Design a protein with these regions (language model features):
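Extended C-terminal regions of large enzymes
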Residues: 1-113
């Protein structure tokens, strides 16, 4: 995968997880719900008589991530606190032999922070 593809996949995953967390969806059912946003949005609409779209889910995730980021900054956390331990970057993971490629400042920039 290219860097742009990794960033896009990571961001999409984080947005869905943040939305699911905000809605209180059970972590054990997320193998189903996190891959089927349309299903979740339709269930919310059916239960509450709303007319939400999948864009709502994406925007909820964006807002949640932004609030979490700001909360952490207000609490005094910095990019240094977001950094993985050094061995993630130096010790290859079997069986692929890959190591982490991105550091906190790069990740946060990709999220728009």
């Amino acid at each position: 995968m290219t860097v742009d593809e990794v960033v896009a996949a990571s961001l999409e995953s984080q947005l869905v997880m943040a939305s699911s967390d905000s809605l209180g969806l059970c972590i054990f059912g997320r193998g189903v719900t996190d891959t089927n946003v349309e299903f979740v949005v339709n269930a919310i609409n059916d239960a509450h008589g709303t007319e939400l779209t999948e864009d709502f889910y994406t925007e909820l995730g964006k807002e949640t991530l932004a609030l979490e980021y700001q909360f952490n900054r207000d609490a005094g956390f910095t990019d240094a606190d977001d950094e993985l331990p050094e061995f993630f970057y130096t010790e290859p993971l079997a069986p692929t032999g890959k190591v982490a490629r991105f550091h906190a400042p790069e990740v946060n920039r990709s999220l728009g922070y």
